[in-house]
Amino acid sequence: MADVGYTSSPAAKEYEAQLGDYFALLKPRVMSLVVFTALVGLQAAPVSVHPVIGFASILFVAIGAGASGALNMWWDADIDAVMRRTANRPIPAGRVQPGEALNLGAALSGLSIMMLALTANFLAAGLLAFTIFFYAVIYSMWLKRWTPQNIVIGGAAGAFPPVIGWVIATGSLSIEAWLMFALIFMWTPPHFWALALFMKSDYDDAGVPMLTVTHGRKKTRAHIIAYTVLLAVLAVGTGFSAIGGPVYLAAALVLNALFLKGAIDIWRRDEDTAIADEYRVEKKFFRLSLWYLFAHFGAILLESALRPFGLGGW
């Protein structure tokens, strides 16, 4: 771990960790997105899976996601202690020792990969292993601290769950799986750059080279609208694929109109206005981005649910 002066207080060292503290290491909010998108990938696949196998497989994907979260918190404990947004996480708050997080993450990683291989197939397990490695090592240990493109490249880690879900069902990769991957991959930069606009001081203090730190807020705003335009083209275009359909397309048109408007509003903002209203527009866009992704994958899920009745898809 890089050292930026992280230490736990004597009182914190006497604290006995509770079950909830260990669960918090797994990043349950992130895990919920992983579970949902993996489930959509599983359900959208053209091959049906026995419910028990499907449930168990998604459970092991969730455990793998939690494992990578624990490894990330172990490695990032020093900068988490500096940032207001993360200072109350279990390790910097002294509720869990770093070694415990490392052991938990390593154990759950091995368990999830092995069990997914036995439950589903080796390709799905291999993709899960790569995802954990990418997030814990490539992103957390390298990209996050060394390049302003950290969340652009690192976004791949969060984009793999629907691909894994698809592979659980089919045992192979296809263009539809990669379209779902691309949706999350292209969504990640504007989502996190919006956060970085109103949390810039946190990244400054921690020495994390987010785009707002290295290039300033003005260029970050321009990057947000550029990626949002590309994302909108991709999202609407997905409506004409095998996982799309009229329901998805209608949802995508509305969602991307709203998202583009939000990005334009951010792009037009001057810094004095943003400071005066405490980044109200940026915070609104950040919240919208969460609903944006859930709604797109919800529409894909609805299309797959309607398809057996002859109502979904084209």
Swiss-Prot record:
It is a multi-pass membrane protein. It comes from the Bacteria. One of its GO terms (cellular component) is plasma membrane. It is an enzyme of class 2 (transferase). Signal peptide: none annotated. It catalyses: heme b + (2E,6E)-farnesyl diphosphate + H2O = Fe(II)-heme o + diphosphate. It is found in: Cell inner membrane. GO terms for molecular function: protoheme IX farnesyltransferase activity. It holds the Pfam family UbiA. Its EC number is 2.5.1.141. Interacts with CtaA. NCBIfam families: cyoE_ctaB (TIGR01473), PRK04375.1-2 (NF003349). Belongs to the UbiA prenyltransferase family. Protoheme IX farnesyltransferase subfamily. This is Protoheme IX farnesyltransferase.
